[in-house]
A protein has these predicted regions:
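A late C-terminal transmembrane helix in Major Facilitator Superfamily
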Residues: 310, 318-368
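Helix-loop-helix hairpin linking two adjacent transmembrane segments in secondary transporters
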Residues: 135-188
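Cytoplasmic helix-loop-helix junction between adjacent transmembrane helices
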Residues: 100-144
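Conserved MFS/SLC helix-loop-helix module at the cytosolic interface between two early adjacent transmembrane helices
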Residues: 51-93
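Central cavity-lining transmembrane alpha-helices of secondary-active solute carriers
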Residues: 41-58, 112, 116, 251-263
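C-terminal transmembrane helical hairpin of 12-TM major facilitator-type secondary transporters
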Residues: 271-317
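Structural signature of the two symmetry-related core transmembrane helices
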Residues: 68-83, 272-287, 369
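Transmembrane alpha-helices of Major Facilitator/SLC transporters
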Residues: 245-269, 279, 283
């Protein structure tokens, strides 16, 4: 197995573990009888660990090396899954779920920033001299997205039809991760340890602020809208099938995203961003129609279009970051990019809070309008070729 493939396997494993909880949220509401607010808090505490994991892990790997950060993150994800498996034990269920989700947030943040940078560096000479310039971004995005999709698919199916529904999904992740750890141990280090150039500060080029930042929140906001908001918008139409349906939408969204990412290599980052935002607008309008008609069937193609938008935007953002980042700050800038993408995860919470005022069909149209504004901004600012910016000395 080539070095970049083994590093990408780490991204797959961490994405699998991080997102397996998505399809299990319905189970905790229906079988463990947690309120919707409590289950949302389980989801939110993950973000509380993720952001510091990203913002500290990326720059730290620029200083100490990729393998020294990624391997411990993978190892810690094993007991984190073990703690989540205690969610089925009534006496410790709630604190176990909070603790496990927070731990997963931290290790996912570290692994996403470090693993993406590592895959990029292993997708060039001397490790892979035949790879094209965008191979690193594409490989990292596909591996992460495949993990994000496989985790909830397997977990949802096991929770629906296998024994031990609150334990077995996490055990599968533990076995997978142990195998990946063994594969990653021998991957070459691409970033030798050295002195910090500027502590933990990360230089943000003007193009990042003008082109990448307006698009980035939609990269993860898109799938969140697809498989978190649509089931909620359809409500009673899913009686008895909520877990399976949420798993279906998650799989369609992320599966289409993976397929599109393989094709996105042919596009420039700006074109990918524009097409991604345009697809998101279209997908949200279809989702609004599905919510207005109460049609679970129509929500499936909406998820497919939104998944295509996700795939295009994630790759486009990573390509922009990897082109503009200095080698010494690749991990740090990648971390900032991912941190901004996760801003999009507030959208389901915001729409849930507003649903009593306007209703999901109207809210989804409103979000489509906001995505259209972002499309206009990116289309305008992306026309200008920015001069290369270097961080200030010292």
């Amino acid at each position: 197995m080539r070095p970049h493939t083994r590093a990408a396997a780490a991204l797959f494993a961490i994405g699998y573990g991080a997102n397996q909880f998505s399809s299990l949220m319905v189970m905790y509401r229906e079988q463990a009888h947690y309120s919707a607010v409590t289950v949302a808090a389980f989801f939110g505490v993950y973000a509380a660990g993720l952001v510091p994991g990203l913002l500290l892990g990326g720059p730290a790997s620029d200083r100490w090396g990729r393998r020294r950060l990624l391997l411990p993150a993978l190892v810690v994800s094993v007991p984190a899954s073990g703690v989540l498996a205690l969610g089925g034990v009534p006496a410790v269920s709630e604190p176990a779920l909070y603790t496990g989700r927070f731990a997963f947030g931290v290790v996912t943040g570290i692994a996403m920033a470090v693993g993406t940078s590592w895959v990029k560096e292993l997708s060039q000479a001397p490790w892979d001299p035949d790879a094209d310039a965008g191979a690193g971004a594409r490989r990292a995005a596909i591996a992460l997205s495949a993990g994000f999709g496989a985790g909830p698919l397997v977990a949802g199916l096991l929770a629906q039809w296998a024994p031990l529904p609150m334990e077995l999904p996490y055990l599968v992740h533990v076995v997978l991760t142990l195998a990946v750890v063994a594969a990653v141990v021998g991957v070459p280090e691409t970033r030798p340890a050295g002195a910090f150039r500027s502590g933990l500060r990360v230089h943000l080029p003007r193009r990042f602020r003008r082109v990448v930042a307006p698009m980035a929140p939609w990269a993860f906001g898109a799938p969140a809208l697809s498989f978190a908001v649509q089931p909620a918008a359809l409500g009673s139409r899913l009686a008895g099938f909520g877990l399976v349906y949420a798993t279906l939408l998650t799989t369609v969204t992320l599966g289409v995203g993976v397929v599109v990412q393989s094709w996105a290599r042919r596009l420039s980052p700006v074109t990918g961003s524009r097409l991604g935002l345009a697809a998101l607008v279209a997908g949200l309008l279809v989702a609004a129609c599905a919510a207005a008609l109460g049609s679970p069937v129509l929500a499936v193609p909406a998820s497919a279009v939104i998944g295509a938008a996700y795939g295009l935007m994630l790759v486009a953002g990573l390509l922009e970051v990897q082109r503009m980042a200095e080698p010494a700050q690749l991990g740090g800038l990648t971390a900032v990019y991912y941190a901004v993408t996760y801003v999009g995860f507030v959208l389901p919470v915001a729409l849930a809070a507003l649903s009593g005022v306007a209703g999901y069909p109207v809210l989804l149209v409103g979000v489509a309008v906001l995505a259209g504004v972002s499309l206009a901004v990116v289309a305008w600012t992306g026309r200008v070729r920015e001069p290369v910016e270097l961080p200030a000395a010292g």
